[in-house]
Regions:
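Short, flexible active-site recognition loops that position polar ligands and cofactors
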Residues: 157-169
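Flexible, glycine/proline-enriched loop segments at strand-loop-helix junctions
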Residues: 1, 22-28
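ATP-grasp fold ATP-binding core
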Residues: 8-23, 45-54
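Residue-level recognition of oxygen-bearing side chains
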Residues: 19, 33, 156
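Short amphipathic alpha-helix with an adjacent loop that forms part of the alpha/beta core around
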Residues: 2-7
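Phosphate-binding site of ATP-dependent enzymes
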Residues: 29-106, 110-113, 134-141
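Conserved metal-phosphate-binding beta-hairpin within the catalytic cores
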Residues: 60-62, 119-151, 161
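A short, polar/charged loop-to-alpha-helix boundary motif
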Residues: 83-84, 151-160
Length: 170
C-alpha cells in the first residue's frame, strides 16, 4: 500500500479486526477519506489495511476428511456495490450469488489448490471458508480465512452445500 516514495497508493481497503460480516469495511480512494476513516475506526477497533484488488470475489468452503481436504463448489459474488461490504451482504437486491462460480476450469483448479494449501498451512480443522479475489489476469489473491463462517439461511457455506445436495439441520 506504500510505493517506493513512501506514498500511500490508493485505492485501498480498511478493515476492523474485531467485527464480522464485513461491518466497518471501507474502500478508501483518497488521502482525505483515509484520514477520516482512520479517525473513526481507531475509536472502535484495531484495524488493518490492504491493497484494493479489482476482480471477481469468490469464496470456498473447505473441510478436512479422512483422505484429505474436501472443497464445496466455489461461490461467486456479484455485487452492485464497489466492494462486498455489510450493505451488499444484507440489503436485498444488492448482491447475486452464483454456485458454482462462473470461472474457467483452469482458474477453478488454481483456486482450489491455493485455498487447500492455505487451509493446510494454517492448520485449519473442521469447516472453514476462504475468501479470495480473481483479478483480470486470473491471478488468485486470498483475502481472508473464516474459521467460524455464518450458517444462516443467507450464509455462503449453506448455499455452497445446498448446490451439491448437502443440507444442514436447524
Amino acid at each position: 500500500i506504500v510505493n517506493e516514495n513512501n506514498k500511500i497508493v490508493f485505492p485501498l481497503i480498511l478493515k476492523p479486526i474485531s467485527n464480522g460480516s464485513s461491518v466497518g469495511v471501507s474502500l478508501i480512494k483518497t488521502k482525505k477519506e483515509f484520514e477520516e476513516a482512520i479517525k473513526k475506526i481507531e475509536k472502535i477497533s484495531d484495524y488493518f489495511i490492504e491493497p484494493y484488488i479489482k476482480g471477481k470475489e469468490i469464496t470456498v468452503g473447505l473441510v478436512r476428511e479422512n483422505n484429505g481436504i474436501f472443497t464445496l463448489p466455489i461461490l461467486g459474488i456479484n455485487t452492485k456495490n464497489e466492494i462486498y461490504d455489510y450493505d451488499a451482504k444484507y440489503t436485498p437486491g444488492k448482491t447475486e450469488l452464483e454456485v458454482p462460480a462462473k470461472i474457467d476450469k483452469k482458474t477453478e483448479k488454481k483456486v482450489i489448490e491455493v485455498c487447500s494449501l492455505a487451509y493446510e498451512v494454517l492448520g485449519c480443522e473442521g469447516l472453514c471458508r476462504i475468501d479470495a479475489i480473481i483479478d483480470e489476469n486470473n491471478k488468485v489473491y486470498l483475502m481472508e480465512v473464516n474459521t467460524q463462517g455464518g450458517m444462516t439461511n443467507t450464509s455462503d457455506i449453506p448455499a455452497m452445500a445446498k448446490s451439491v445436495n448437502i443440507e444442514f439441520e436447524d
